Curated annotation (Swiss-Prot):
Swiss-Prot/TrEMBL keywords: Cytoplasm, Glyoxylate bypass, Magnesium, Metal-binding, Oxidation, Transferase, Tricarboxylic acid cycle
Annotated pathway: Carbohydrate metabolism; glyoxylate cycle; (S)-malate from isocitrate: step 2/2
Protein name: Malate synthase G
Entry binding sites for acetyl-CoA: 118, 125-126, 276, 313, 541
Naturally occurring in which organism (per UniProt): Pseudomonas fluorescens
Active site per the UniProt annotation: 340 (proton acceptor), 631 (proton donor)
Gene coding for it: glcB
Enzyme Commission number(s) of this protein: 2.3.3.9
């Protein structure tokens, strides 16, 4: 049992109580008594409201289920269906026009466009890597991934392969010609770079000199002007740096001694307390809060072993250059950090209220992550985050404007507890639940003074799409979802509503994750679709991917693109409400088996590491051994998809169990190299992870909105108790 300490009307887990009093509070200007008294009141005032909002979710779902059951066997009538959703208050009248009025937003969010990382803050090494991914090597990203083909002798190999290196150099020179064109000639022919009279002078083959077509692109340099070691350029609001050192293995093969091009990459990072972590008790939550506190204080550090050597990884300092006018130019050396709190659903026993009930985890996250952020706000930090005095909190999985209003109220109450000016706490609204999508304008309006971000989370959104219409019939195959009418309308609608409510220049309009971290050539080809769609940020799975995705923001001027898109006809709510039902369900046995196996294998591969190792975000090989980033959102889709096919007789429970049991040894084989791994097969009945997977699928229709957290949390706690963790 967790040891608790009585504080006013709260029982606080001792590990959390000690962390707050001894680590988080000192230096904030707030006393422990103040904090706990304020937390007590916030929890007891707002927990009942939180509970009522969850009851409303269940009521809507029950009504929608009944409507579909009543109309079973009939052709779906979209007009009657929409009228029904309006009658019950699910689809609300459109909010009156307004403009968001958020103040004190950092440029990285309001006025720049670039990649966004999402990482589990529970893992200090990942958190530090992401924080430092504001700047990334283009050469490393190209050389070390499939972005550069291994054909024609360009294999990666163990040592440096000059053939491959030359391909990387050629790619980078082409980028320079595109992003910083010369007034005459090409970077391809450059033999030297220097600064003279505040301008870039480029020596070319043949002896001639050239300069930038637009001299304003030169921002600064490092080293002597006549022999700079770095040249800082700017294009589409993003910086990049030509690094020069002819003594390096790469530089000595380059005519101009260029050793790398450093990209300004992950402008922002979401430090995640939610879908990518496995945190089920006070001990887990303190790990999260301690890492976030370290990021806010600027002193997070981690011992890292690499190549037989151990070193301490810390947060990078700012970058300093000599400007063209001779004055110092200082650029942020780190990604601007958001923190993603959990949503409104779960409760946790890290704190118990006066009646002995677990408190809403989202309220706890809000209080603790905001408390930690004071250290960055008040100058205690050696690595300041926001330069405008804001704290950026992403709030996921909200259903409709009442829930957005509740978050707005919660943030106001937290500001009062922490003596923060009103609207210090900013909100990122995840548009990943159907009731938020169709009422998005009203959701933004409910937080119009705090909103700094809307983002389409198509993975969770697909899970909610399936669960909401669970009773309507069998859904299309999972891979076909991406081409269904609702999803394109949903993606466009988010941009349309964001632009019409004045988010440009104040907030990010974001797009979802590239889930295949090993397939960078495909990402380079495809993910340009996100800036073209009007998104000034989109999610990437790694610092390497951030450096490559940054190239897309040099190809697309997102703010100009948004101005074009603002003139188009708005996406249709009717299209968004189009249920992705299969037109016919006469799939072959092989097609059904493949669908089932693919889902089952992904579920098992993710759940086994969640339950057994407490790992909330994994690169899980799919059925074709392609590594996919899996988190709770992908688990929600896969489990709900099987549950839907089971509900409508496309598959039987016996088929589902047979697939799970057949896929378990496949997952075991894929994890054979992990010393900490515990096999799923053959003792299925006593394997907690396997039983969790079974429950998620077989009982999938009963999970609240199709969420996986209730089962995962219960089973992880069972595993920890059984194994003395």
């Amino acid at each position: 049992m967790t040891e608790h300490v009585q504080v006013g009307g709260l029982q606080v887990a001792k590990v959390l109580f000690d962390f707050v009093n001894n680590e988080a509070i000192p230096g904030t200007g707030i006393t422990a008594d103040q904090f706990w008294a304020g937390a007590d009141k916030v929890i007891h005032d707002l927990a009942p409201k939180n509970k009522a909002l969850l009851a409303k979710r269940d009521d809507f779902q029950a009504r929608i289920d009944t409507w579909h059951q009543t109309h079973a066997g009939q052709a779906h009538d979209p007009v009657a269906y929409k009228a029904f959703l309006q009658d019950i208050g699910y689809l609300l009248p459109e909010a009156a026009d307004f403009q968001a009025s958020t103040q004190n937003v950092d440029d990285e969010i309001a006025r720049m466009a670039g990649p966004q990382l999402v990482v589990p803050v529970m893992n200090a090494r990942f958190a530090l890597n992401a924080s430092n991914a504001r700047w990334g090597s283009l050469y490393d990203a190209l050389y070390g991934t499939d972005a550069i083909s291994e054909a024609d002798g360009a294999e990666k190999g163990k040592g440096y392969n000059k053939v491959r290196g030359d391909k990387v150099i050629a790619f980078a020179r082409a980028f320079l010609d595109e992003a910083a064109p010369l007034s005459a000639g090409s970077h391809v022919d450059s033999t030297g770079y220097k600064i003279a009279d505040g301008k870039l002078i480029v020596s070319l083959k043949g002896g001639s000199n050239s300069g930038l077509r637009d001299d304003a692109q030169l921002i600064g340099f490092q080293g002597p002007a006549a022999q700079p070691i770095a040249i800082l350029l700017k294009h589409n609001g993003l910086h990049f740096e030509i690094q020069i050192d002819a003594s390096t293995p790469v530089g000595q093969t380059d005519a101009a001694g260029v050793k790398d091009v450093l990209m300004e990459a992950a402008l922002t990072t979401i430090m995640d307390c939610e879908d990518s972590v496995a945190a089920v008790d006070a001990d887990d939550k303190v790990v999260i809060y301690r890492n976030w506190l370290g990021l806010m204080k600027g002193d997070l550090a981690e011992e890292v072993a690499k190549g037989g050597k151990t070193f301490t990884r810390t947060m990078n300092p700012d970058r300093v250059y000599t400007g063209v006018d001779g004055q110092d130019v200082t650029l942020h050396g780190r990604s601007l950090l958001f923190v993603r709190n959990v949503g409104h659903l779960m409760t946790i026993d890290a704190i118990l209220d006066k009646a002995g009930n677990e408190v809403p985890e989202g309220i706890l996250d809000g209080l603790l992550t905001s408390l930690a952020a004071i250290h960055s706000l008040n100058g205690n930090s050696s690595r300041k985050n926001s330069r405008t005095g804001s704290v950026y909190i992403v709030k996921p999985k909200m259903h409709g404007p009442e829930e957005a209003a509740f978050t707005n109220e919660l943030f106001g109450r937290i500001e009062d507890v922490l003596n923060l000016p009103r609207n210090t706490l900013k909100v990122g609204i995840m548009d990943e639940e159907r009731r938020t999508t169709v009422n998005l304008k009203a959701c933004i309006k409910a937080a119009s003074e705090r909103v700094v971000f809307i983002n389409t989370g198509f993975l969770d959104r697909t899970g909610d799409e399936i669960h909401t219409s669970m009773e309507a019939g069998a859904m299309v195959r999972k891979a076909a979802m991406k081409t269904e009418k609702w999803i394109g309308a949903y993606e466009n609608w988010n941009v349309d509503i964001g632009l019409s409510t004045g988010l440009q220049g104040r907030a990010q309009i974001g797009k979802g994750m590239w889930a295949m971290p090993d397939l960078m050539a495909a990402m380079l080809e495809q993910k340009i679709a996100h800036p073209l769609a009007g998104a000034n940020t989109a999610w990437v799975p790694s610092p390497t991917a951030a450096a490559l995705h940054a190239l897309h923001y040099h190809k697309v001027d997102v703010f100009a693109r948004q101005a074009e898109l603002a003139k188009r006809e708005r996406a249709s709510v009717d299209d968004i409400l189009t249920i992705p039902l299969a037109k016919n369900t006469d799939w072959s046995e092989e097609e059904i088996r493949n669908e089932l196996d693919n889902n089952a294998q992904g579920i098992l591969g993710y759940v086994v590491r969640w339950i057994d190792q407490g790992v909330g975000c994994s690169k899980v090989p799919d059925i074709n051994d392609v590594g996919l980033m899996e988190d709770r959102a992908t688990l929600r889709i896969s489990s709900q998809h099987i549950a839907n096919w089971l509900r409508h007789g496309v598959v039987t429970q016996d088929q589902v169990m047979e697939s799970l049991k057949r896929m378990a040894p496949v997952v075991d084989r894929q994890n054979a190299g992990d010393a900490l791994y515990r096999p799923l097969a053959p003792d299925f009945d006593s394997n907690i992870a396997f039983q969790a997977a079974v429950e998620l699928v077989i009982e999938g229709t009963k999970q609240p909105n199709g969420y996986t957290e209730p089962v995962l949390h219960r089973k992880r706690r069972e595993f920890k108790a059984k194994n003395g963790l």
